[in-house]
Amino acid sequence: VAKQDRAVRTRQILIRAAAEVFAADGYALASLSMISKRAGVSPGALHFHFASKDDLAREVESEATDSGRQLAEGCRGTAGSALQVLVRTAFGLVLAAADDPVLRAGLKLSGDPSRKSDAELLNWWRGLVRELVVQARDAGELAQDVSADDATTTIVAATVGFAVIAMAEAEWPSAERLTRFWSLVLPWLAAAPERVPDLVTHGAQRHHRVH
């Protein structure tokens, strides 16, 4: 059991180290030797867990997507309407990506042209945004002249953009900046503009990364 526990810990250390390297340098420049050195693990131990750099990258993408799903489920449990869940989840994902190298690496790997990726994290996020937008539309929360496609495209592009900037400037995304973004977007998106302040406040709750 102790040996199994050590193996699990070593695997997680390697995944985090790989995420830090991928997030900082990209897939093409990253090497297994860089990752093993960062993890403080021998090359042999790394190869015991992962046969190739691509195997590591796929595992990082998978863990990033799992982290996103867990965050989204937590937001579903604390928010009411679909629009509230959407705003709160977007706040959480952007701020988590700024702090979590696994999420940052998952986003970076999804769009890295140097490797073939299933874009697992991006596809999951796009799908979730569309699901919540459609639910909001069906509940009468969206303005009549707003299409689900336009809303999904705008929100996905903006949130991923925030996260991409965080890769170069970790302090840039903040609850304050996200509040300003949603204060601009929600009057166009929401059927009831008078709800915008409450939607923004609800979305920012418990997210205090303000600079």
Which residues does each predicted region cover?
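Secondary-structure edge/capping motif, primarily at the C-terminal ends of alpha-helices
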Residues: 75, 104, 162, 166-169
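Short secondary-structure transition hinges
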Residues: 91-142
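C-terminal peripheral helix-coil segments that are non-catalytic and often amphipathic
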Residues: 123-139, 168-211
